[in-house]
From Swiss-Prot:
Pathway: Carbohydrate biosynthesis; gluconeogenesis; Carbohydrate degradation; glycolysis; D-glyceraldehyde 3-phosphate and glycerone phosphate from D-glucose: step 2/4. This is Glucose-6-phosphate isomerase. Its EC number is 5.3.1.9. InterPro entries: G6P_Isomerase, Phosphoglucose_isomerase_CS, SIS_dom_sf, SIS_PGI_1, SIS_PGI_2. It comes from Mesomycoplasma hyopneumoniae (strain 232).
Length: 429
């Protein structure tokens, strides 16, 4: 997988002035004696993040489920417990619709009674299994959903069979969900203690749903291993992940930009963008610091946000992911019944037009709109590319947060709403 990075801005950026800082933080990310080693399991790849025995066990379970005509998996989780898997499924498969293929449904990521009710109604005619993902089991959204859905599954097929179709991904050390799994004799997959939720897609958290959907997990791992090696140097000129991190830092610190918009030209990247927003939002948004991570899908959002991006306030820059080779393509043929300018495009493909839109929009926004643009060109949307891109952003995120002067691996602000909600519900936390 090839990844190219191109900066389109009139702003002069001197990266080499920061090489000493990069060296220091690179050591902190990679040194076995780092004070943050308890959070760096994702970077100890594949030794810590990948458990071959557990993946083999998952494969056997998935094979058994499919043999028993269980073709729907309900993944219950919120934040990093589901965003990575959802991003991977859409990135690799596209948005469908699909016929006669295993289906993965995501629940427990909101407190919407309407969404939960409608999905349960849909499941009434399906043979489904459950994979609940939570490090502790105390997060309210997945906890409520799991309790309701597990009862529904028991009502449908009985408790004995329901136990064989329910899989728990959680800490194997302690937690409410671990106790539930043990007391009900449910299959358990491990949430690795040294890997935070937003960094966990390249682990058992993401792998079970992907295996169920018949995604080639081995290729995802191969792509991530290659990226891990590629971005293992501290040299800014040779490490694109660090160059991206430094670009973001300079936009924020030296030029006072407050927002980064991640832009993609494929609708199936919507949830990849959502995963990216959590990764950077939770890692950097603390101590009154950090770029606000926003996203858009072009050309769709050009018809809603395009005016603002071109002519509105200039407090943002754009990072663009462009996929060089589309998953599928369609040719445009002349239609004599339509006497329009579109007929002049006959012989071209839809992806060729999309590419021209990308070129035109990037030029308009960077040159005429005076918005700095950074372009990440990736080869395709294969499993290997997904693994590579995830590792690229995770390494960039850690470095970016250290440059900013914050801890990339905690999220103390999230506890505030949880504490207030607990008070409202009369809970002890």
């Amino acid at each position: 997988m090839s990844l190219k990075l191109e900066v389109k801005t009139e702003i002069k950026l001197d990266y080499q002035d920061f090489q000493n800082q990069i060296n220091e933080f690179h050591k902190r990310i990679n040194d076995k004696n780092s004070p943050d080693i308890i959070f760096l399991g994702w970077n100890n790849f594949p030794e810590v993040a990948i458990n071959p025995q557990e993946i083999a066990r998952m494969r056997k379970i998935v094979e058994n489920l499919h043999q028993n005509s269980i073709n729907v998996l309900v993944v219950i989780g919120i934040g990093g417990s589901y965003l990575g898997a959802k991003a991977a499924l859409d990135f690799i498969l596209g948005l469908g619709p699909f016929e006669n293929k295993p289906e993965v449904i995501f629940l427990g990521n909101s407190l919407s009674s309407t969404d939960l009710y409608q999905k349960i109604e849909y499941l009434k005619t399906k043979n489904f299994a459950i994979n609940v993902i939570s490090k502790s089991g105390s997060t309210i959204e997945p906890a409520i959903t799991f309790q309701i859905l597990y009862q529904f599954l028991i009502d449908q097929i009985g408790e004995k069979l329901a136990k064989t179709r329910t899989f728990v991904t959680t800490s194997i050390k302690s937690g409410e969900l671990l106790e539930i799994a043990k007391s009900n004799e449910l299959e358990i997959f491990e949430v690795i203690e040294s890997i935070g939720g937003r960094f966990s897609v390249l682990s058992s958290v993401g792998f079970f749903p992907l295996l169920f959907a018949k995604i080639n997990v081995d290729e995802i791992i191969q792509g991530a291993i290659k990226a891990h090696k590629k971005y293992s140097t501290s040299s800014i000129s040779q490490n694109l992940a660090y160059k991206y991190a430094l670009f973001r830092f300079l936009m924020y610190k030296n030029f006072n930009y407050k927002t980064e918009i991640l832009i993609s030209y494929e609708p199936f990247l919507i949830y990849f963008n959502e995963w990216w927003k959590q990764l950077f939002g939770e890692s950097e948004g603390k101590n009154l610091k950090g770029l606000f991570p926003a996203s858009a899908i072009f050309t769709t959002d050009l018809h809603s946000l395009g005016q603002f991006i071109q002519d509105g306030s200039k407090n943002f820059f754009q990072t663009i992911i462009y996929i060089k080779k589309p998953k599928f393509d369609l040719g445009i043929k002349k239609l004599v019944q339509f006497n329009t300018k579109i007929n002049k495009l006959s012989g071209k493909t839809v992806s060729e037009i999309n590419f021209q839109a990308f070129l035109a929009t990037t030029l308009a926004h960077s040159s005429y709109g005076n918005n700095p643009n950074l372009v990440l060109e990736i080869a395709d949307s294969s499993p290997k590319t997904f693994g590579h891109l995830v590792m690229f952003f995770e390494k960039a995120c850690a470095m970016s947060a250290y440059l900013l002067g914050v801890n990339p691996f905690d999220q103390p602000g999230v506890e505030s709403y949880k504490n207030e909600l607990a008070k409202n519900l009369g809970w002890d936390r």
